[in-house]
Amino acid sequence: MPVLEIDLLDETNKLLDEDKQLVENILQFAAGYLKIDEGTELSLTFTTNEGIREINREYRNKDQATDVISFALEEMGEGETEIDWADFDLETPKMLGDIIISTEKAEEQAKDYGHTKARELGFLAVHGLLHLLGYDHMEPDEEKIMFGLQKEVLDAYGLER
């Protein structure tokens, strides 16, 4: 039984079914590997360089395309009040947030790094999932932890460089 409930949207209408399935399989594997609660939800959107550039500009003030952006729902934004969900008796599934991947950037990077587009999409999906779980790579020690875990998950799945 799948651990994650994944709401997948392909805005490009160009992604192959096997690529979508691979990314879903890797995310499900990663969720099990990382012991994420069953029924946890996330949304995954595949877009173009222009689509991700608009998001990057609007939400991160960076007017350029990037490979993956994650928006964690439990991450505190500036001026927001923290909600302690333990105070509520909720039977609703936990929603991690959104992962947005540029398929064009994934293709470019796959060529640059000399591996398949599928490997790059899997890498970006796991990278995005780790961000939703609170991992980051702004500091060298954080980067070592996050990238180490990312490699561990991808290697365990069998998607190596």
From Swiss-Prot:
Chief location: cytoplasm
Residue positions binding Zn(2+): H127, H131, H137
Top EC category: hydrolase
Secretion signal, residue range per the UniProt entry: none
HAMAP family assigned to the protein according to its UniProt record, in alphabetical order: Endoribonucl_YbeY
Biological role stated in the UniProt entry: Single strand-specific metallo-endoribonuclease involved in late-stage 70S ribosome quality control and in maturation of the 3' terminus of the 16S rRNA.
Protein name per its UniProtKB record: Endoribonuclease YbeY
Organism: Listeria welshimeri serovar 6b (strain ATCC 35897 / DSM 20650 / CCUG 15529 / CIP 8149 / NCTC 11857 / SLCC 5334 / V8)
